[in-house]
Amino acid sequence: MSNYIYSEKHFNFIDKIIKNRREKFYNFISEKVNLSNVKSYLDIGTTQNENHPSSNYLNKKFDFIKIHNAISDQIITDNRFSNILKKSITSDFSKEEIELIKSDFTISNATIEHVGSFKNQKKMISNMIKLTRNVMVIQTVNRYFPIETHTKLPLLHFLPKKKYRKLLKFL
């Protein structure tokens, strides 16, 4: 993920809406997955941005899970993680890397849309399967949600793709 898509200017009421949305997603997962059996957790696409209540929200909510692992192309300094691989989820993984971060529960929250082509998306899913022992969750942004969740700007993502991408470069 590129850092340029994350707006540093957040609006409190919008962050509350985003946080509420992430809380609903956490509740959905909690209803569907027996988290009491989960001993290790892998977050795909962890962000280095910890400045806002909605940043890495699920990682914080899963604090009762003993082992937290992360894969990110960003530099993650958070001490919450037991193991961090700084690489793309579409990269090839060695047997040692797989064994190091393979987890009971693997989640990708709004990452798959950043890996590019359909081929890369398939590679990401294939890698996630290799890195997951029991449960794998892939979530992507709902295009019809009124707030663009990376920049936290209302309606930005409804612009034509070319204008949207151009505007992201200025943020």
Q: Where are the predicted features?
A:
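Class I SAM-dependent methyltransferase Rossmann-like catalytic core
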Residues: 1-36
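Transmembrane helix-loop junctions in multipass membrane proteins, especially transporters and channels
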Residues: 58-59, 154, 165
